[in-house]
Design a protein with these regions (language model features):
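Active-site-proximal beta-alpha loop/turn segments in soluble metabolic enzymes
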Residues: 215-233
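Outer membrane beta-barrel
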Residues: 29-56, 67-216, 238-254
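Detector for outer-membrane/organellar transmembrane beta-barrel domains
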Residues: 27, 248-330
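Boundary at the C-terminal end of the N-terminal hydrophobic targeting segment
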Residues: 17-21
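Short, contiguous, pocket-lining structural segments
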Residues: 189, 209, 231-241, 268, ...
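Short, glycine/acidic-enriched capping/hinge loops at junctions between secondary-structure elements
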Residues: 54-60, 286-289
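Positively charged n-region of N-terminal signal peptides that target proteins for export
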Residues: 1-4
Length: 330
């Protein structure tokens, strides 16, 4: 089993978490577009740097050299998020960045060998999110119901809290990845292009989306025994997928201004949330038995609980945080 010790990451993640309450940075850099501040642009930037020491699996090769232990430093995430509140009802969101650049991998497509486009160099900058959103029913303190709708490349992909997690405030070192079951198959880095609706009714929060999955064309291995058939992603002209997440917030209410779910509030909120979500895509995988191709639907379900309870002196920002999730992947 590969064992990895991330020496500096935990410290860096802690710094990122605490920075959310910084009086200098706050929720990013805000530029008002009118004197009242109701029209504005906001920018949020974050970098996550990993220094690692890893005990490698037997037979591991790096650069044609067999190794048993490896130390390296890499760029886990470099991101820039910008959104423009054009009016109280209309917002434009753009999120760009890179992921996982090291000395040996993460470079742009076609990079390799040595030189200007050698191994790991010049990673491909791409859009993580790009959508427009309109508030049909504006959220107000005195009104229990709100509704916003939007379209574009988005992160409202349902399933679970961890499936829509922010990368700014994990309590753990990173996400376990299986919370994104289709990552880089029928989605673009856990996103799809589609239409979404989000909102609240008192303490109940809902998110729904209708999306066009990215095309996949993996070829299944043909077998003679149906029990041995293994489905692969192959949707060709993909049919529309549907996703949703529903959550009840028993204590403090969370913001749903953006889709990114917080990992820990470090004592600034008292949270106890119970949620459930789904993702379904018809005719999205195929198997081959005796030369006969059969299509299958993807049906995913999750139920989760999130607890984040302040403890001790509020000024020290301490909390007991817990998260548990059940996934059913078919």
């Amino acid at each position: 089993m590969k064992k990895t010790i991330l020496i500096l990451s935990l410290l860096m993640f802690s710094g990122l978490v605490f920075s959310q309450g910084s009086p200098d940075y706050g929720g990013g850099l805000k530029f008002n577009l009118n004197p009242e501040g109701t029209k504005y642009m906001r920018f949020i930037a974050w970098n996550q740097i990993w220094l690692r020491s890893s005990e490698m699996n037997p037979g591991t090769m790096i650069g044609d050299e067999a190794i048993t232990k490896q130390e390296d430093i890499g760029l886990r995430r470099l991101r820039l998020l910008a959104y423009a509140q054009i009016s109280p009802r209309y917002m434009i969101v753009t999120h760009i960045g890179i992921n996982n650049q090291t000395f040996i991998n993460g470079g742009a497509s076609g990079s390799g060998g040595t030189g200007g486009y050698g191994n790991g160099k010049k990673p491909g900058l791409f859009f993580h999110d790009a959508w427009n959103e309109y508030a049909v029913v504006l959220p107000k303190e005195e009104k229990p119901f709100s509704l916003s709708m939007g379209a574009g490349l988005h992160y409202y992909m349902g399933l679970s809290r961890l499936t829509m997690s922010s990368t700014l405030n994990y309590m753990t070192i990173d996400a376990p990845i299986f919370n994104w079951p289709m990552i880089e198959n029928s989605d673009q880095f856990a996103r799809q292009i589609g239409i979404f609706a989000k909102g609240k009714y008192n303490r109940f929060e809902y998110r729904l989306s209708l999306n066009k999955p990215f095309s996949t064309n993996n070829v299944p291995v043909d077998v003679t025994n149906a029990d041995l058939a293994r489905a692969v992603d192959n949707n060709h002209n993909a049919k529309w997928s549907k996703a949703g997440y529903f959550e009840y917030q028993f204590f403090d209410k969370e913001s749903n201004f953006l889709p990114f779910k917080v990992g820990t509030y470090l004592g600034t909120k008292k949270m106890f949330n119970v949620g459930a979500g789904f993702y379904t895509a018809p005719s999205s995988t195929v198997t081959s038995v005796n030369g006969e191709i059969e299509k299958h639907a993807t049906n995913l379900f999750a139920g989760d609980i999130f607890v984040d309870l302040p403890i001790g002196n509020k000024e020290k920002k301490m909390a007991v945080t817990g998260y548990s999730v059940f996934y059913s992947y078919d």
